Amino acid sequence: MMARPGYRKFHGFKSTVFGKSIPRKYLLDYAQARELAAEFNTLVEDGGIGLLIGEVGIGKTTAIRAFKEELGERSCRVCYVGSVKHSTAVLQDFVLQMGYQPSHQRANLLRQLSKAISQTWVEQRKKTLLVLDDAQATEESLLEDLRLLSNFDIDSQEPLILLLVGHPSLQNRLRKPIHLALWDRLRMLFRLEGLSLEETHQYIEQHLKAAGGPVELFTPEARVAVFEQSQGIPRRINRLALEAVKRSARNKVNTIDENMIAVAAGVFDGV
């Protein structure tokens, strides 16, 4: 049996702390997350195309995962492609998730996807949500294919919902003349921002709770220092806080203060 990492044993954590994902019940419930959830729900209800943007590590994928879990398979079929791939590979991935054996020809893939979306609506009365993450790196031709795919309707309903997710540069890209037809069809545009100071306090506490550790491990001053170094970006918070936790265990220190945060930040030359 693999031994627990030293910090888990020293601080009494039951699981990894400040990891990439935590159980949904521990996700921070804050104003911006609630606003985004409302936008997601409206998009699914009304159909159409949505755009979610934010800096690297801001929590876009986490927000999508939480919404997908909440949505389940009740009224919508969700297909997610999250890594940068060639446009044909993206379409093949979507087709495979819809339950079809994907073709090797692009035109056939679009027909397969269109048929699967229509069939899901007609037979199950379920819409299909296609989520394309890291869309800022997507080929121009794929964006156009997805726009054309979203054109059809059945019984005055739009059975396809398309959600593009990416860096802020994606918004500028979609506003170029080549993609204006897609831009004009957007029904949702949401930019995810970093956490506030108070939200950063709560975020740290939620992660400590999720791992079963001491919620007072970080002093108030340390939490302020984490916020200042990370700018409230969750991935940076996680990296900095975990480094501080590991160092505190190695030094057999039961409380993390702002000085330890400064040392931890130096490892990454800031975060």
What residue ranges belong to the model's regions?
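Mid-core helix/loop region of P-loop NTP-binding domains shared across ATPases and GTPases
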Residues: 8, 86-93, 101-145, 153-158, ...
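Conserved AAA+ ATPase "SRH/arginine-finger" region at the nucleotide-binding site
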Residues: 81-83, 174, 187-200
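A short, basic N-terminal segment
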Residues: 1-46, 266, 270
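Walker A/P-loop nucleotide-binding motif
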Residues: 45-66
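Short regulatory helix/loop adjacent to the ATP-binding pocket of P-loop NTPases
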Residues: 68-70, 170-185
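C-terminal alpha-helical "lid" subdomain
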Residues: 2-6, 65, 181, 198-205, ...
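Short hydrophobic/aromatic beta-strand immediately N-terminal to the Walker A/P-loop
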Residues: 50-53, 80, 131
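AAA+/P-loop NTPase substrate/partner-engagement loops
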Residues: 72-97
